[in-house]
Regions:
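Short acidic-glycine-tyrosine-enriched beta hairpin
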Residues: 70-85
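Ligand-binding loop in jelly-roll beta-barrel domains
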Residues: 86-107
Length: 107
């Protein structure tokens, strides 16, 4: 039997990384929960996520702007968004001066 795990999503954040950091918190056959940490990153020009699973994201710190099917969506801490499977989306910008911390659930 596995033990319960207690942790904090704001502990051990990478320091001003030049790339986004993805930390898997839970993986099951049809569900994945991850912490994403960004410092000013954005999706490469012309790149779009188009995922087979729904994705729910919660912005916990920093600010972000997404493009979801051609619509600009600005996010502040506490904002969350459900992105349905097959919806093209990309990250336009994230805060560069503070960590932008996301919690993402893929199901």
């Amino acid at each position: 039997m596995q033990k319960n795990v207690v942790s904090n999503l704001f502990v051990d954040l990478p320091k001003h990384a030049d790339q986004e950091w993805f930390t898997s918190l839970l993986e099951k056959p049809h569900c994945r929960i991850e912490r994403i940490v960004s410092y000013g990153q954005s999706s490469p020009d012309g790149f779009w996520y188009d995922q087979a699973q729904d994705e729910w994201v919660l912005l916990m710190s920093g600010e972000a702007e997404l493009d979801v099917d051609g619509e600009s969506v600005k996010r502040l801490p506490g904002d969350h968004l459900m992105i349905k499977a097959g919806t093209k989306h990309r990250v336009v910008r994230t805060s560069a001066d503070v960590p932008t911390v996301w919690l993402a659930v893929h199901c």
